[in-house]
């Protein structure tokens, strides 16, 4: 049986996205805002029940739950929620912030959150968009925060992984988030997977947070050191996707708040969809680790890009499997800006729907392989997983997301490094990060180490574009692992026929 996932949502951005994420999971599993369970809809399509009941999981694999009609239900919310004796669900989530307003809105919108899992600063004045303030606060509250985590771990029968929602550019999400990465890694080591859903700042040279490059580079150092997989979401790209949505729906009236909320929903939908094969199980993946291992061939190449379609527009209502695969590979739908010279290391497509047409999928895989450039040391594998659609969702149209590992990270990190260098060269705003000569030396050392770490990842992604990438001392270690990016070299066998229901 797949293990449970514990979620940490840290800072304003992390908690705003976290709220959308839990609302999405609750909707997919028929859980109301107070944690009570909704019966299966009376008009549920027989095809939906058949798809779920034929998902391939055995009675020994999962604790089965009974439907109102006496049949077993094959969704598994217990991987992300605890179920109380009174049959109410509570997210396996810890909410952390240094000011109360966002968490107050979250707990009001979703009373199912466990109030004992909420941690707020007594001062309530935030981190002032400063990584150091957030990191120091996390250090001071380390024991309290670890107690929250340990208590949630004790509720798990088979903990599989932790996941973190946060921003890399502010104060709390970056600073406290960085500290959480350190303490979880120190406490649980590599026994448990540690994934992050990290929101990156705008690529524009100007920002409301003038110290944004400092915060970002300090956070990246911790992501490089401690995360097992980081899903990158870029504000620029999210806003571009939302603009496409609104432009395709001329009747929708919108403002900047709509774009902001829509961006959070996109992140939440991708994050929820990644775990679809676990929550609505099939044959292909039995754990988050098995999913991640298909995407990350070496520990350093762990920054992932995603794309999503459709967006509830008329244009996308009639996409078949072939069209969906091609749309997912369209750069304009990616949550991180991808240029024309990008090379792919791995690609995993989720097609979520019913009775998928294997012929259309094979055509889509072959066409994608023709269009996409892969690094030379991997097979041109375009992996496809058939995701089961929740019977609680009224929309029965085919949906899809794509997760890839690719060299667009070179441009992302180079831009961050350039912005950092411009500030540090002028020693701009450095006085915000220390108050004494001793602190200054310590902070400058952290900056130097962080810069070197980011530069090393840029070099790693550049090196992976060469055929000689694996010709080093670590080649034997890689061959012993379960890394992705390999596959079998042809698209046909990248579909699991049993999981496709064919």
From Swiss-Prot:
InterPro entries: Gamma_tubulin, Tub_FtsZ_C, Tubulin, Tubulin/FtsZ_2-layer-sand-dom, Tubulin/FtsZ_GTPase_sf, Tubulin_C, Tubulin_CS, Tubulin_FtsZ_GTPase
Keyword Membrane in annotation: no
Binding site for GTP: 169-175
Keyword annotations from UniProtKB, A to Z: Cytoplasm, Cytoskeleton, GTP-binding, Microtubule, Nucleotide-binding
Cell location: Cytoplasm, Cytoskeleton, Microtubule organizing center, Spindle pole body
Broad class of the protein's primary localization: cytoplasm
GO cellular-component term (any): inner plaque of spindle pole body
GO terms of molecular function: GTP binding; structural constituent of cytoskeleton
Region of interest (Disordered), residue spans: 51-73, 473-502
Pfam family, one: Tubulin_C
UniProt-listed GO biological process terms: cytoplasmic microtubule organization; microtubule nucleation by spindle pole body; mitotic spindle organization; positive regulation of cytoplasmic translation
Cysteine pairings via disulfide bonds: none
Comp. bias intervals (Polar residues): 51-68
CDD domains, A to Z: gamma_tubulin
Record-linked PANTHER family: TUBULIN
Function, as annotated: Tubulin is the major constituent of microtubules. The gamma chain is found at microtubule organizing centers (MTOC) such as the spindle poles or the centrosome, suggesting that it is involved in the minus-end nucleation of microtubule assembly.
Protein name: Tubulin gamma chain
Organism, as annotated: Candida albicans
